[in-house]
Amino acid sequence: KLISRLYDADSGTVQIGGTDIREIHTDSLFKYVSIVFQEVILFNTSIMENIRLGRLDASDEEVIRAAKLAGCNEFVSRLPDTYQTIIGENGAKLSGGERQRLSIARAILKDAPIIILDEIAASLDVETEVQIQTGLNHLIQGKTVIVISHRLKSIENADKIVVMKAGTVEACGKHAHLLKQSPTYRKMIEKSN
């Protein structure tokens, strides 16, 4: 929420490329960041238009390409009006995994250099999580990715893991380092196994 400036820091700074984000106009900052939330925000319009929110000037072909990369095409092709199907308020006519894949497609279409994945697998079953992983792999390629997760499997291969405890940073490092240095991280791993 700090990176996307939903809130400003009470103290200290949040920087992108060495620039305090408070010095970056909100519209410009929005272009640099894509957020995929656990609770996907969808509108009572077509699948095509829900994905196009990632980049309003995208052609239909670009929207469909992003949808295919996110793994949407399989379920969309079974819908009565495919990409023109109206999905209901907040995607009520879709499963959680389908809604999540639309959100990933939207982020792929936006093609922002910074991706925030906020607990996106928390409410998904293991099979659905595996299905969306392919879309995520397309989304994060060559990007700066910030993953907020309690599912530790999803962060084990990260370049840098930040362990938070009671609102403060307890430790930073790679998985193997944190197993040795962070009691909190070690306990979380033990509980997840």
Where are these regions (language model features)?
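ABC-family ATPase nucleotide-binding domain "signature/switch" substructure
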Residues: 1-6, 27-39, 45-50, 66-72, ...
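Conserved coupling/switch loops of ABC nucleotide-binding domains, chiefly the family-specific signature
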Residues: 10-13, 166
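Conserved ABC transporter NBD signature motif
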Residues: 12-19, 29
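ABC-type ATPase nucleotide-binding domains, specifically the catalytic core motifs of the NBD
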Residues: 52-60, 74
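C-terminal boundary and immediately downstream tail of ABC-type ATPase nucleotide-binding domains
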Residues: 180-193
